[in-house]
Amino acid sequence: PSLTLGRISEKRPGHEIRMLFPKLAWPARPGVARAFNKASRTPVDAALAEFRQEMVEFPEQRPEYTWDLRSDWETRHKGTDLISGIMTFGSYTGGAHPNPWLVSLNFDLRQGRAVELAEIFKPGSAWPARLSAWCLRELKARDLPDPDSGASADPRNFVVWTMAPQGLTILFPPYQVAPYAAGVQEVLVPWSEVADLLRPGGLAAPLAGLRS
């Protein structure tokens, strides 16, 4: 399988769009490639639709400044079973600074679908509490003012994540655990910290060195 970058570019008076997103080509398994490309385009298309809708609803604002929408992709891991990466979005429609957000894509090449974080763990296991404890310890060591609520043991706090041989990375967008100026906060959770909770035969097991 070959992973490249797709691009959507548009520059007109009053607005500029530059979207980069991953595209998978896999002649041997075209169905998997189509599923991956649909998964990667979904958040891009949603961002474009919202941006264009705002341009229609608030046309009077744009002559004062240029509206901007961007996305970038970073591959964190590409293996025979998994593609894991982060899409970073940013839109500027006025205000003090751009509005950033993150979308992760963890795609199981065996099954041809994106996976949720809960799926790499044993059903019913206390993975949110385990991740919360590790992340809070790491975040508090950075002297952040109040990371507790944004990294509590709520599964909704861990929706942006990637996997690689060195561990599970949790990403917290601006405002979730720190002020905007602190930027995105990343916490690497070594596989050794959650190995006992991983689903046997699951997508993370080979990365963690666990045998089926």
Name every feature range the model reports, one short phrase each.
Residues 1-212:
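Compositionally biased intrinsically disordered regions enriched in Thr/Gly
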